[in-house]
Curated annotation (Swiss-Prot):
Keyword Phosphoprotein: yes
UniProt-listed SMART domains: eIF5C
Gene: Eif2b5
One Gene Ontology term, aspect cellular component: cytosol
Known partners and oligomeric status: Component of the translation initiation factor 2B (eIF2B) complex which is a heterodecamer of two sets of five different subunits: alpha, beta, gamma, delta and epsilon. Subunits alpha, beta and delta comprise a regulatory subcomplex and subunits epsilon and gamma comprise a catalytic subcomplex. Within the complex, the hexameric regulatory complex resides at the center, with the two heterodimeric catalytic subcomplexes bound on opposite sides.
Function: Acts as a component of the translation initiation factor 2B (eIF2B) complex, which catalyzes the exchange of GDP for GTP on eukaryotic initiation factor 2 (eIF2) gamma subunit. Its guanine nucleotide exchange factor activity is repressed when bound to eIF2 complex phosphorylated on the alpha subunit, thereby limiting the amount of methionyl-initiator methionine tRNA available to the ribosome and consequently global translation is repressed.
Activity-regulation annotation: Activated by the chemical integrated stress response (ISR) inhibitor ISRIB which stimulates guanine nucleotide exchange factor activity for both phosphorylated and unphosphorylated eIF2.
InterPro entries, A to Z: ARM-type_fold (IPR016024), eIF-2B_epsilon_N (IPR035543), eIF2B_epsilon (IPR051956), Nucleotide-diphossugar_trans (IPR029044), Trimer_LpxA-like_sf (IPR011004), W2_domain (IPR003307), W2_eIF2B_epsilon (IPR044123)
One GO MF term attached to the UniProt entry: translation initiation factor binding
Listed name of the protein: Translation initiation factor eIF2B subunit epsilon
Positions of region (Disordered): 1-37, 442-479, 517-538
Subcellular location: Cytoplasm, Cytosol
Source organism (scientific name): Mus musculus
Length: 717
């Protein structure tokens, strides 16, 4: 709950701010134009999400090392190079660690041109809370930069700042924010899918007219009014990367205070655009083409940005520059982007192929192959080790014969002999794995038991919340050798059991992918869509289309039954709907399967028991089997249909005893093949609910019957 000392001039800023102050304001009357006030920045040193859990259980995201430099140091170097003279760093999670790091850094040295003031509170839950505190404390006196502490950039912000100030001068403070974006193709590695946006922008003024996140969308809709009466034209932009850098007027903090529903910048942007005609506020865009800016929002972005730093795309923020003035950051740079720190030892026959950073005091054994990797200080690598896109932090030990591919090993993690880490693995601090074990793709191992997270919910933003209790749990709960090896220390994290909407982000892995089975990931959104979820996605065109398509298919089948329409004509109608709503064949198959299974529920008021449900469904399956067979053809289609059937019965638990009869009907009608049913039943990488479903006695008897039938068929052959 600590705060900084009063900021010089803050009281004056509070007195004048409500009058629309800020650079370019109407305060000067007849006097000479004053030079712009010192540039300030608000740096948010918290992400307010758990995307980096369990890594960030040990240290805050802004202190995670990227190319052996803490993320926040890149951000502060960017702000200082931009000309920022005063930066307010707002901390919540692990605030003591951030404060200690900054106080030991050059940023808190008396000679620093950028005065860093640290403000901590356990009450911050969002960007909105931070900006409301900025307003309450009257910290900003003019236009300021708003940025997160995990942004890496070399953008010269001066031009954007001049444009912003000029607009506010000419248009009487109408423009409240200028967002900085970079031109970037949709397929570029540093485009984070979660941050992708499509915008409508005034061609002449760069005023943002429409702003929409595109994650998961296939079609975009724009109000027709955008294109009416715009003499200078409107540009639709999908070639932009969000740098997460915003130039804000002082009114921004006040607007967050006035609108408590604003929690994120996106909330703010949508609110301003929605109320532009009423309040008169506008948001503008500044686009850079050659400079660099990106936010490390997940480990996919961590990997991409780290590679860009090593490949010198963020010059002058390159490893050998040592912009932090640290004695351990003295690197030499050689061909193929090989960086070596002091006192590095490289064994006989070891090859550093390209894009490799070796931290100070690191020892590499003989006959190692290292490429596209970052190794922190004081690491020890044994003989015959392969590192490819590996990110090793401080003090990591890798024993002989290990192979690490596209994975992250945090401080003092240890990999024993002959361990293989497949892509997207994460070992958090002090984890030990091995020997002689292969970690599957996407494995996350931590010394913190996954179930300890439930106990943290009430105090998740406290630096020491639940620490003592968690240590006791570690003592009581042993490690699983099947997961971490005979000498391993750590727990395998899984996210399949997370169901609450508040914790939905925990279903996102550290790498920006989903931690779930392949079948689950391919069918997650194409089935029935919860209306509340639909509302929460702000009218997503893709979800709207799937929902409408599902209703249209239901109507088509109802009409087909009433009017005795042939299956051939039903297929033609469904295909026309498919093209009208731009639905993929996979989505058609999944929606059709669900609609058929749900059809009896739509026709009867009240609950159905399993016997009555089967009595209603089986004649429908027989009648519509040609339609289903038209879409369920390949083995992959069969598995998708089975996943949709599984989802249906997981959602309708009272009908689960009828599942065996339903699958028998699908089998006898030759919609599903016995080998794919057996393959589906034998899947191990499924949810706990899916495993429980497979324990149903009727289902197990049906599977046993199928296996015996398959064996008899094999004997006859």
């Amino acid at each position: 709950m600590a705060a900084t000392a009063a900021v010089p001039g803050a009281a004056a800023g509070r007195a004048s701010k409500r009058g629309g102050g800020g650079s370019g304001g109407g305060g000067t009357q007849g006097a000479e134009e004053e030079p712009p006030p010192p540039l300030q920045a608000v740096l948010v040193a918290d992400s307010f999400n758990r995307r980096f859990f369990p890594i960030s259980k040990d240290q805050p995201r802004v202190l995670l090392p990227l190319a052996n430099v803490a993320l926040i140091d890149y951000t502060l170097e960017f702000l200082t190079a931009t000309g920022v003279q005063e930066t307010f760093v707002f901390c919540c999670w692990k605030a003591a660690q951030i404060k200690e790091h900054l106080q030991k850094s050059k940023w808190c040295h008396p000679t620093s041109p950028n005065v860093v003031r640290i403000i901590t509170s356990e009450l911050y839950r969002s960007l909105g809370d931070v900006l409301r505190d900025v307003d309450a404390k009257a910290l900003v006196r003019s236009d300021f930069l708003l940025i997160y502490g995990d942004v890496i950039s070399n953008i010269n912000i001066c031009r954007a700042l001049e444009e912003h100030r000029l607009r506010r001068k000419l248009e009487k403070n109408v423009s409240v924010m200028t967002m900085v974006f970079k031109e970037s193709s949709p397929s570029h590695p540093t485009r984070c899918h979660e941050d992708n946006v499509v915008m409508a922008v005034d061609s002449a003024t760069n005023r943002v007219l429409h702003f929409q996140k595109t994650q998961g969308l296939r079609r975009f809709s724009f109000p027709l009014s955008l294109f009416q009466g715009s003499g200078d034209g409107v540009e639709i932009r999908y070639d932009l990367l969000d740098c997460h850098i915003s130039i804000c007027s002082p009114q921004v903090a006040q607007l967050f205070t006035d609108n408590f529903d604003y929690q994120t910048r996106d909330d703010f942007v949508r609110g301003i655009l929605m109320n532009e005609e009423v309040l008169g506020n506008q948001i503008h865009l500044h686009v850079t083409t050659r400079e660099y800016g990106a936010r490390v929002s997940n480990l996919h972005m961590y990997s991409a940005v780290c590679a860009d730093v090593i490949r010198r795309w963020v010059y002058p923020l390159t490893p050998e520059v040592n912009f932090t003035d640290s004695t351990t950051q003295s690197y030499t740079h050689s061909r193929h982007n090989i960086y070596r720190g002091p006192e590095v030892s490289l064994g006989h026959g070891s090859v550093l192929e390209e894009n490799v950073l070796l931290g100070a005091g690191t020892v590499i054994g003989s006959n190692c192959s290292i490429t596209n990797s970052v190794i922190g200080p004081n690491c020890h690598i044994g003989d015959n080790v392969v590192l490819d896109q590996a990110y090793l932090w401080q003090g990591v030990r890798v024993a002989a014969g290990a192979q690490i591919h596209q994975s992250l090993l945090c401080d003092r993690a240890e990999v024993k002999e002959r361990v293989k880490l497949k892509p997207y693995c994460v070992l958090t601090s002090q984890v030990v794995v091995g020997p002689d074990i292969t970690l599957p793709e996407g494995s996350v191992i931590s010394l913190h038991p996954p179930d300890a997270e439930e106990d943290e919910d009430d105090g998740q933003f406290s630096d020491d919340s639940g620490a003592d209790q968690e240590k006791e749990k570690v003592k009581l709960k042993g490690y699983n050798p099947a997961e971490v090896g005979l000498e391993g220390q750590g727990y395998l994290w899984k996210a399949e059991g997370v169901n609450s909407k508040e914790d939905e982000e925990l279903r996102q892995s550290l790498w920006g992918l989903m931690i779930k089975t392949e079948e689950e990931s391919e069918t997650e959104s194409e089935g029935s869509v919860d209306p509340e979820e639909l509302d929460s996605r702000a009218g997503s065109p893709q979800l709207d289309d799937i929902r409408v398509f599902q209703n249209e298919v239901l109507g088509t089948l109802q009409r087909g039954r009433e009017e005795n329409i042939s299956c051939e004509n039903l297929v033609l109608e469904i295909n026309s709907l498919k093209h009208a709503y731009n639905i993929s064949l996979k989505e058609v198959m999944q929606v059709l399967t669900l609609v058929v299974l749900e059809f009896p529920l739509q026709q009867v008021d009240g609950l159905l028991d399993p016997n009555r449900y089967c009595a209603l469904l089986l004649p429908l399956l027989k009648a519509w089997s040609p339609v289903l067979r038209n879409y369920i053809k390949r083995a992959a289609d069969h598995l998708e249909a089975l996943a949709a059937i599984e989802d249906f019965f997981l959602e309708h638990e009272t009908l689960v005893t009828s599942m065996a009869k339903v699958l028998m009907a699908f089998y006898q009608l030759e919609i599903l093949a016995e080998e794919t049913i057996l393959s589906w039943f034998s899947q191990r990488d499924t949810t706990d609910e899916g495993q429980q479903l497979r324990k149903n006695q009727q289902l197990q008897r049906f599977i046993q019957w199928l296996r015996e039938a398959e064996e008899e068929s094999s004997e006859d052959d």
